[in-house]
């Protein structure tokens, strides 16, 4: 029998992307609740319990409710794309390239928390340096990022695209999360293995999909004052053999006049760059990804495949 997949919240931005990715798969059976019944709690519970894997594409509180509907019904495995369980010790963190053995943890888990889009890029840059001992745990990490507006869901999409919307946003780029209390920070700190709360400054650009995440560092404050080549080598070794995460060669990065946030829009990969000047003792680590690809729906499908042994 084909494994049954239920996307709870398939009409939202992330859910629609996952549904599209699964539409042509003949090795799965996607079961869907009628749209008119999606607020029927009892019927939702029936669909959740009928699934081999339930992918939750819901706000945090709704995701917690969905999980509660499966209490005592352990045959359904869960992938939660919300923030609700990303730092919960009982949930496997769904970043397959995080560390050695992470793929296996995801494959064997019943509960998988899909990473956030921004943390995916930031952790991809920070975690290898922490694991290699180059980045001190107490380093004051700063993360600057820009995302396509689809990351804000249907409401922000409407505000950016519909000029007749009462809250239409004319800005081409805007900062948010100004009090430095963004909900992604605990996730970034925990899975980045950081002792100090990182400063996270996100922004949104007037483009639908794409993302750039930057982590600038002082080489002199890293263990052994490493060269750019050493930092690059650590990233390259960490992601060796991975088909989704690519570490761009130093010589290629050195020739780039710019990095385009939309380069990977519509794709599930992620590119990592090491920029900097040895003389100044500074390095800028950059992650490029699609906020709806490796940053959301693409990662959910990757995790689903691992859980199904594919």
Curated annotation (Swiss-Prot):
GO molecular function, one term: N-acetyl-gamma-glutamyl-phosphate reductase activity
Recorded GO CC terms: cytoplasm
Entry's localization field: Cytoplasm
SUPFAM superfamilies: Glyceraldehyde-3-phosphate dehydrogenase-like, C-terminal domain, NAD(P)-binding Rossmann-fold domains
Record key words, sorted: Amino-acid biosynthesis, Arginine biosynthesis, Cytoplasm, NADP, Oxidoreductase
Reaction catalyzed: N-acetyl-L-glutamate 5-semialdehyde + phosphate + NADP(+) = N-acetyl-L-glutamyl 5-phosphate + NADPH + H(+)
Record InterPro entries: AGPR_AS, AGPR_type-2, NAD(P)-bd_dom_sf, NAGSA_dehydrogenase, Semialdehyde_DH_NAD-bd
Database matches in NCBIfam families: argC_other (TIGR01851)
The family this protein is said to belong to: Belongs to the NAGSA dehydrogenase family. Type 2 subfamily.
Protein's job: Catalyzes the NADPH-dependent reduction of N-acetyl-5-glutamyl phosphate to yield N-acetyl-L-glutamate 5-semialdehyde.
Protein name: N-acetyl-gamma-glutamyl-phosphate reductase
Upper lineage: Bacteria, Pseudomonadati, Pseudomonadota, Alphaproteobacteria, Hyphomicrobiales
Gene that this sequence comes from: argC
């Amino acid at each position: 029998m084909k494994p049954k997949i239920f996307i709870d919240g398939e009409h939202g931005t992330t859910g629609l992307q996952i549904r599209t990715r699964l539409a042509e798969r003949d090795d799965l059976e996607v079961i869907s609740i009628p749209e008119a019944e999606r607020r029927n709690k009892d019927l939702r519970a029936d669909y959740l319990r009928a699934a081999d894997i339930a992918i939750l594409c819901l706000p945090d509180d709704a995701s917690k409710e969905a999980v509660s509907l499966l209490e005592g019904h352990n045959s359904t495995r869960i992938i939660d794309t919300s923030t609700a369980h990303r730092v919960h010790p009982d949930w496997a963190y769904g970043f397959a390239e995080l560390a050695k053995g992470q793929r296996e943890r995801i494959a064997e888990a019943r509960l998988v928390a899909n990473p956030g889009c921004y943390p995916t890029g930031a952790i991809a840059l920070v975690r290898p340096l922490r694991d290699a001992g180059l980045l001190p745990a107490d380093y004051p990490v700063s993360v600057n990022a820009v995302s396509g507006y689809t990351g804000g869901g249907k409401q922000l999409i409407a505000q950016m695209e519909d000029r007749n919307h009462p809250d239409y946003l004319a800005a081409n780029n805007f900062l948010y999360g100004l009090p430095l209390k963004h909900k992604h920070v605990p996730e970034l700190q925990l899975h980045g293995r950081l002792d100090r709360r990182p400063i996270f400054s996100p922004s949104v650009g007037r483009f639908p999909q794409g993302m750039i995440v930057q982590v600038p560092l002082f080489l002199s404050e890293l263990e052994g004052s490493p060269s750019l080549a050493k930092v690059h080598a650590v990233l390259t070794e960490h992601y060796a053999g991975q088909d989704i995460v690519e570490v761009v060669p130093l010589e290629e990065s050195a020739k780039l006049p710019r990095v385009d946030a939309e380069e990977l829009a519509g794709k599930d990969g992620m590119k990592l760059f090491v920029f900097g000047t040895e003389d100044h003792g500074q390095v800028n680590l950059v992650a490029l990804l699609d906020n709806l690809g490796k940053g959301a729906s693409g990662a959910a499908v990757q995790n689903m495949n691992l859980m199904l042994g594919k």
